[in-house]
Amino acid sequence: MIKKIPAILVLEDGTYYKGWSFQADQSIVTIGEVVFNTGMTGYQEIITDPSYFQQIVTFTYPEIGNTGINSEDIESQTISIKGLVAKNICKISSSWRQQESLVQYLNRYKIPFIFGIDTRSLTQYLRRSGTMNGCISNKNLNHAYLQRKISEVPHMTGLDLIPNVTTNIMYDWDEKSLPSWYLADRNREKIYSQLKVIVIDFGVKLNILRRLATLGCQITVMPASTPTQDILSCKPDGILLSNGPGDPSAVNYGIKTVKELLNQNIPIFGICMGHQILNLALEAKTFKLKFGHRGINHPSGLKQQVEITSQNHGFAVDLQSVLKLSLQVTHFNLNDITVAGTGHSRSPYFSVQYHPESSPGPHDADYLFEYFIEIMKQFRKEAN
C-alpha cells in the first residue's frame, strides 16, 4: 500500500529540508550530487537521461508527474537519476498516453524521492552555494548522521562515470517503429543516401539515435572503451560522440581514442560530454560550473543569432584554452557567456554543449544533424 511517510533531504554542509514520500514499503537512503532542472515539462525524459547518473534532481516547476509515464518518452531503458526532489508529485496522473504513474515508476525502480519542500528556496541556495552532495532518506531522519554519511561519498570532480552507463557490446541500432510523436519524420522521404555512423556511447540518449535513423543513417553503437582500430574497421562515414555523466577530464581512454581518430580526418560530431571530450582531445581544457546548466530554455548563439536549447551539464570547456587552438567558438551560452559550441577551422570536427535532439526541449538546433549529414556526404564524395 502506498501512503505518505516523512522523508528528509540533507545537504553536505548540514542544510536540510523535511518533506514527504510515497514509499511506505521501501526504506531507502540515497546519496548523490544535488542539482536542479528548470524545465516545466519533460520529467520522464530527464529522469531516464544517462547524463543524470549519480545525481539527485530537483525540479523547479512545482507540479511533477501530472501526465504519468509511458514507454515512448524514455531516453534509456532504465531510470538514471539517484533521487528526485519536487514541490509536489502527483499521485494520480491523467493522460491518454500514460501507462503508470510517476510514483509507481519510481517505486518500481526503487528510486527515492521527496516532495513537500520549498524547492524555490533549495534552488536559490544551490545557486548561491553551488551544487553539492546530498542525501534523501525516508528511513533514518537524523540529519547529523546523514551528513556524516554524505562525507563518505566522493564529489563529481574527477569521477569517471561512463562505465556505469555505456553499452557493454557493439550493436546496430534500427528502431522499427518510431514513437507516435515522430509522425512528421515517419512520413518524410529519406532523401539522404545510407551513411554509416559510429556512435561512441558515453551514455547516449535514444533520441540522438532516432534523429540519425530518420535521416537515413546506418547506426552502429559502440562501447566508450572501444579501441580505435575497431572503430576504423567499420569504415564509418562519420562518428558521433554522445552525451554522458561525470567529469570529462577523467575519461582518459575516451580522450585517447578521439585523439587517434582526429588523425583520420573523419567527420566527428560531439554532443554534451562528446563536445567536452572532443575539445579535450584537441588540447582544450574543461572546468566545473558552479551550479551547471540544466533546463530547456537556455539561449545559445553567436553574431546576433540565438537558439533556445535544451542543456544538461555540470562541466564546460574553458574559453581561453579554446582561443589558443585552431578552434572557432560557434556558440556561447548567452546566460553566462560560457562556450556552447566549437568547430575546427580546417577539419570536419564540430560539437555543441547542448542537446540538438531535445527530448525534452525545443528543436531550434535540430539542423545540426542535417549539417552532420552534409559533412559526411562531402567526406564520402572526396574519399571516392
Swiss-Prot record:
Catalytic activity of the protein: hydrogencarbonate + L-glutamine + 2 ATP + H2O = carbamoyl phosphate + L-glutamate + 2 ADP + phosphate + 2 H(+)
Single GO MF descriptor: carbamoyl-phosphate synthase (glutamine-hydrolyzing) activity
Disulfide partners: none
Location relative to the cell: Plastid, Chloroplast
One GO cellular component term noted in the UniProt record for this chain: chloroplast
Family per record: Belongs to the CarA family.
Function recorded in the entry: Small subunit of the glutamine-dependent carbamoyl phosphate synthetase (CPSase). CPSase catalyzes the formation of carbamoyl phosphate from the ammonia moiety of glutamine, carbonate, and phosphate donated by ATP, constituting the first step of 2 biosynthetic pathways, one leading to arginine and/or urea and the other to pyrimidine nucleotides. The small subunit (glutamine amidotransferase) binds and cleaves glutamine to supply the large subunit with the substrate ammonia.
Name by which UniProt lists this protein: Carbamoyl phosphate synthase small chain
Gene symbol of the encoding locus: carA
